[in-house]
């Protein structure tokens, strides 16, 4: 019995020892595998100089970029800029960071301070910042072949030169340009990783006043005094949504013009009604013109398309008020002429009778006795008209004929013609306006 227990205890001891040995061998193999694929950062960067670029003194570092446009929060016409939040990803190969295996590992963002990274900056940026909540929004990832992926989340405000001459039917072209600050083309070469496909997110953006029509990427060279620098350009076109402005400005201004035409159907004798309509429409049009410029600075020197249309509408509204002034004045003149008519006729008859009755005696009274004769000199000044008086008489006669030619004989015709001409000319002005600004 005791012999059997001894044999069982011996077998159990041998089995336990063998299992421990096999377990230690497995742990050693796993640790060795991890050490080969995921080396310690200190061992990997031993002798690493972050102040020297990869291939220092040799071929330039080729950096491939991709962009994700998270949002375009604002587009300011007054400041000529736009604000966007982007995810910038850069890839390059650093032979000093090669390790065995086919795996990759992500480092803590704070370790980027110990590695060389490109000095990429955004050209024409007014202000930019890196997001820091809850930690710095940066990512650094190492691959076994030495490839480094460096990603950043940035919000930037970039200049965008705008041509507002066709506002609000304009299309603006904005750019986002990336370039190395200190390394020229002999040290760093930038490129888009997948061409136009390197940029994502623009097609999904929904902007308040704009629609993104198209975008494309370019690679150019920036020539500066310090050298030639590779520049990556993202160019995109923004077309303004005109429907908002049609409802806010164009429709109200058109209604005011039509409202001013109501006075053509009101009698000329209704002075308060027609004057009230004319003055009210003029003041309303002025208020609308001032309100349309509140979104743009007063120093803006552009004559915009919306200003042209509001100017046209204001001209028609003010013209309707002047039309009533002309018609009313002509009506008063006609009434005055009618009142003076009988008296003037009797006056002309009396004068004619006096002249006819006195002309014979007038002829008899003219004698050569009134002519002063002194030797051979004869003074005819009392019998002839001076040249200056004759010129004045002819000039007054011409002016009188011109005034009579332009005098409105029937003031009611002014309203009758205005009912046709004002709408016709306004429609023609709209046809030319929309055709020019929409298609030219």
Curated annotation (Swiss-Prot):
Xref: SUPFAM superfamilies: Neurotransmitter-gated ion-channel transmembrane pore, Nicotinic receptor ligand binding domain-like
Give a yes or no for keyword Transport in this entry: yes
According to its UniProt record, which reaction does this protein catalyse?
A: chloride(in) = chloride(out)
Q: A single GO molecular function, which one?
A: GABA-A receptor activity
Q: Which domain of life is it from?
A: Eukaryota
Q: Known InterPro entries for this protein?
A: GABAA/Glycine_rcpt (IPR006028), GABAAp_rcpt (IPR008100), GABAAR_pi_TM (IPR047032), Neur_chan_lig-bd (IPR006202), Neur_chan_lig-bd_sf (IPR036734), Neur_channel (IPR006201), Neuro-gated_channel_TM_sf (IPR036719), Neuro_actylchol_rec (IPR038050)
**Glycan attachment residues as annotated in the record:** 43, 102, 145, 196, 228
Arranged from A to Z, the UniProt key words for this protein are: Cell membrane, Chloride, Chloride channel, Disulfide bond, Glycoprotein, Ion channel, Ion transport, Membrane, Signal, Transmembrane, Transmembrane helix, Transport
State its location(s): Cell membrane; Apical cell membrane
Membrane topology reported for the UniProt record: Multi-pass membrane protein
Gene Ontology cellular-component annotations = apical plasma membrane; chloride channel complex; plasma membrane
Is Disulfide bond tagged as a keyword? yes
List all membrane-crossing ranges.
Answer: 242-262, 271-290, 302-322, 420-440
Tell me the first and last residues of the signal peptide: 1-23
Q: What is its main location?
A: membrane
Q: Topological domains (Extracellular): residue ranges?
A: 24-241, 291-301
Q: Which residues lie on this side of the membrane: Cytoplasmic?
A: 263-270, 323-419
| Stored Pfam families | Neur_chan_LBD (PF02931), Neur_chan_memb (PF02932)
Q: Which cysteines are joined by disulfide bonds?
A: 160-174
Entry text on domains: GABAARs subunits share a common topological structure: a peptide sequence made up of a long extracellular N-terminal, four transmembrane domains, intracellular or cytoplasmic domain located between the third and the fourth transmembrane domains.
> What is its quaternary makeup?
Heteropentamer, formed by a combination of alpha (GABRA1-6), beta (GABRB1-3), gamma (GABRG1-3), delta (GABRD), epsilon (GABRE), rho (GABRR1-3), pi (GABRP) and theta (GABRQ) chains, each subunit exhibiting distinct physiological and pharmacological properties.
The free-text function statement in the UniProt record for this protein reads: Pi subunit of the heteropentameric ligand-gated chloride channel gated by gamma-aminobutyric acid (GABA). GABA-gated chloride channels, also named GABA(A) receptors (GABAAR), consist of five subunits arranged around a central pore and contain GABA active binding site(s) located at the alpha and beta subunit interfaces. When activated by GABA, GABAARs selectively allow the flow of chloride anions across the cell membrane down their electrochemical gradient. Pi-containing GABAARs are mostly located in peripheral tissues.
Q: Which family does it belong to?
A: Belongs to the ligand-gated ion channel (TC 1.A.9) family. Gamma-aminobutyric acid receptor (TC 1.A.9.5) subfamily. GABRP sub-subfamily.
Query: Know the name of this protein?
Result: Gamma-aminobutyric acid receptor subunit pi
Give the source species.
Mus musculus (Mouse)
């Amino acid at each position: 019995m005791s012999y059997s227990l001894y044999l069982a205890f011996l077998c159990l001891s041998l089995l336990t020892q063998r299992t421990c040995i096999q377990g230690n061998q497995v742990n050693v193999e796993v640790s060795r595998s991890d050490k080969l694929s995921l080396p310690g950062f200190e061992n990997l960067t031993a002798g690493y100089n972050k102040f020297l670029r990869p291939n220092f003194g040799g071929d330039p570092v080729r950096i491939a970029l991709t962009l994700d446009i998270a949002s375009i929060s604002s587009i300011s016409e007054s400041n000529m800029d736009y604000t966007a939040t982007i995810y910038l990803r850069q890839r390059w190969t650093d032979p000093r960071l090669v390790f065995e295996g086919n795996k990759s590992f992500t480092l803590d963002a704070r370790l980027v301070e110990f590695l060389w990274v490109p000095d990429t900056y955004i050209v024409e940026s007014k202000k930019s910042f890196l997001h820091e909540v809850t930690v710095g929004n940066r990512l650094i990832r190492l691959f076994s072949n030495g490839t480094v992926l460096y990603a950043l989340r940035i919000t930037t405000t970039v200049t965008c030169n705008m041509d507002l001459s066709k506002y609000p039917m304009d299309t603006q072209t904005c750019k986002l340009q990336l370039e190395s600050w200190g390394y020229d083309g002999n040290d760093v070469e930038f490129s888009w990783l997948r061409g136009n496909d390197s940029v994502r997110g623009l097609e999904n953006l929904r902007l308040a006043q704009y629609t993104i029509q198209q975008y494309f990427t370019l690679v150019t060279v920036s020539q500066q005094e310090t050298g030639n620098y590779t520049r990556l350009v993202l160019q995109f076109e923004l077309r303004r949504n005109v429907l908002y402005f049609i409802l806010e400005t164009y429709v109200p201004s058109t209604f005011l013009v039509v409202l001013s035409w109501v006075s053509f159907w009101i009698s000329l004798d209704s002075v308060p009604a027609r004057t009230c309509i004319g003055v009210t429409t003029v003041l309303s049009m002025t208020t609308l013109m001032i309100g349309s410029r509140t979104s743009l600075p007063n120093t803006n020197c552009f004559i915009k398309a919306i200003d042209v249309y509001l100017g046209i509408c204001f001209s028609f509204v003010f013209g309707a008020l002047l039309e009533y002034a002309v018609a009313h004045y002509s009506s008063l003149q006609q009434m005055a002429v009618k009142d003076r008519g009988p008296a003037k006729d009797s006056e002309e008859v009396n004068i004619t009778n006096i002249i006819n009755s006195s002309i014979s005696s007038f002829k008899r009274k003219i004698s050569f006795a009134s002519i002063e004769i002194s030797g051979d000199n004869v003074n005819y000044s009392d019998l002839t008209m001076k040249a200056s008086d004759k010129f004045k008489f002819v000039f007054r006669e011409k002016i009188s004929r011109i005034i009579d030619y332009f005098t409105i004989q029937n003031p009611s015709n002014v309203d009758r013609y205005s009912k046709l001409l004002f709408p016709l000319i306004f429609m023609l002005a709209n046809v030319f306006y929309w055709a020019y600004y929409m298609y030219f």
